[in-house]
């Protein structure tokens, strides 16, 4: 989908699943973490004009897909999954929360702040193909949704291209509205959220999208 910076933990989870599927391991730990809320990290993203300027209302600054979104809010944290061969997990008697049915990646390296639609389209189609699923079999999508003007619009365009008319029936949210953007830790924690959504099953509240951009509806 994009350069490794914000996707490497999802790559790690997908590759770990493939390692288990090949029979090279029974159990893998995979995920990511990031801690970049510092002068260098904030200064770099500020110079790129990627951060929200809503300093007067920081609690309302991270608002993916909202018409007044103006950039992301940096977050810190970690998310790690325990991946395990199904027979191995059953033999141990552990609770199984979800199955990784498919995985796609597309490091198109187009541009770090102005992504192309082609990358996420190929990524989602690859995941569907590996899972042996049709687009209309998907109910929920945890979007990348960083709260940037160009990035969110590009992602919605890609979702529409992959899912067609079914896109209007998808439950789509961005949990970055609650956590901010964890960069290299985003995929790990968002994978945990997605597993929890399957477990409960619920789609977690999408905060602060007061009015969705008209061209994104």
PLM features: residue spans?
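Conserved small/polar residues in nucleotide/adenosyl-binding loops
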Residues: 2-9, 205-212
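Active-site nucleophile and cofactor-binding loops and adjacent substrate-binding regions
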Residues: 4, 8, 174-178, 183-184
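Conserved small-residue
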Residues: 9, 16, 45, 82, ...
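Stable alpha-helical structural segments in soluble proteins, enriched in small hydrophobic residues
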Residues: 12, 123-131, 158, 162, ...
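A glycine- and small-aliphatic-rich helix-loop capping segment at beta-alpha/alpha-beta transitions
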Residues: 19-22, 42-55, 118-119, 154-166
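Phosphate/pyrophosphate-binding betaalpha-module
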Residues: 34-66
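Condensing-enzyme catalytic core mediating Claisen C-C bond formation in acyl metabolism
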Residues: 56-131, 140
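Short glycine/threonine-rich loop-to-helix capping motif typified by GTGT followed
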Residues: 109-120, 146-163, 182-189
